[in-house]
A protein has these predicted regions:
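C-terminal structural segment of proteins
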Residues: 1-190
């Protein structure tokens, strides 16, 4: 293979490469007809405890709960969703836990896919292997397993394995908790 001739490609003009790229991006942005969803006026809450989370959600049950926000961010940037209120659960320490108890793996709603991948290497290598193939490392560092389930996408990667494993969800609203089999969680198309 012959080396690529970069002399006529302004992207590889190392003297002005950065300026060229920046100018191109600014030009694309100014000509864009892309309708980006507006979240500038959204109320944003970051509770520190489960009790604070319960109070914030009880005050506004239509609020969107978020952790990684990877799918939500796509919907917003594509203008598909408008968000009025967000509760970010990443500040709730109780939801950042992952542990093995009684031959079960308990994964909090705020645990990233990368953390699940690392944790499951010994107790559940098939899950670790699957997560290693899931999206990019950047997405796995932000996205959560619970978000992948809650998003209810028909093309979500994790639910098939979780269904085979008879996964269960611990759902909580206020002080009330219940356990629900994953197979009973999604009742229809997203």
């Amino acid at each position: 293979l012959a080396p690529m001739d970069r002399s006529s490609d302004p992207l590889f003009d190392y003297v002005g490469g950065y300026d060229y790229c920046l100018a191109q991006l600014q030009n694309m942005a100014s000509q864009s007809q892309h309708n980006v969803g507006d979240v500038s006026s959204a109320a944003y809450t970051v509770p520190a405890t489960l009790a604070e989370l319960a109070l914030a959600y009880e005050a506004s049950p239509s609020t969107r709960l978020v952790a990684g926000s990877t799918d939500l961010a796509l919907d917003i940037t594509h203008g598909l969703k408008s968000i009025d209120r967000l509760i970010d659960i990443t500040g709730v320490a109780e939801l950042q836990c992952i542990e093995q108890r009684d031959h079960q793996i308990h994964i909090g709603a705020g645990v990233s896919l990368s953390a699940v991948e690392a944790f499951c290497q010994q107790p559940l290598p098939i899950m670790s292997d699957l997560l290693g193939r899931f999206a990019s490392r950047q997405v796995r560092n932000r996205a959560t397993l619970v978000g992948n389930i809650a998003n209810s996408s028909p093309i979500a990667d994790m639910p098939p394995l979780l269904l085979v494993l008879d996964a269960q969800l611990i759902l909580q609203r206020g002080s009330k908790q219940r356990i629900l089999a994953l197979k009973e969680f999604n009742l229809g198309y997203k």
